Amino acid sequence: MKTAIFTVVLALAVFAVLSFGWEANEKALSEEFTELIHEKEAASETEARGCRYFWGECHDHMPCCDWLVCRYKWPITYNICVWNRTFPEK
């Protein structure tokens, strides 16, 4: 009986250690992913864009790309660029 209880306690201790290690690894991966997203976001902000892309917010001073048109779509409260059913010429 003592052996069975000792085995159960030992198994619980092993599971606790493994789950703690897994949680620490998961947190490190989450931090790396967040840093990667911030780097990509910063890189895309530095690019100069001449037009707004699909589902991008548009106004007179922010035109859509050639194959898109600026439309008001409910329930969105601002104008967005939507496809005008044409394809861009290459």
Swiss-Prot record:
Compartments where found: Secreted
Disulfide bonds: C51-C65, C58-C70, C64-C81
Pro-piece positions: 20-50
One protein family per Pfam: Toxin_12
Chief localisation class: secreted
Keywords assigned by UniProt, alphabetized: Disulfide bond, Ion channel impairing toxin, Knottin, Secreted, Signal, Toxin
One Gene Ontology CC term in the entry: extracellular region
Expression sites by tissue: Expressed by the venom gland.
Keyword Secreted on entry: yes
InterPro entries referenced in this protein's UniProt entry, alphabetically: Huwentoxin-1 (IPR011696)
A GO molecular-function annotation: toxin activity
Signal sequence, renumbered to the chain: 1-19
Chain ranges passing through the membrane: none
Domain free text: The presence of a 'disulfide through disulfide knot' structurally defines this protein as a knottin.
Function: Ion channel inhibitor.
Family that this chain belongs to: Belongs to the neurotoxin 10 (Hwtx-1) family. 13 (Hntx-13) subfamily.
Name of the featured protein: U7-theraphotoxin-Hhn1f
Organism annotation: Cyriopagopus hainanus (Chinese bird spider)
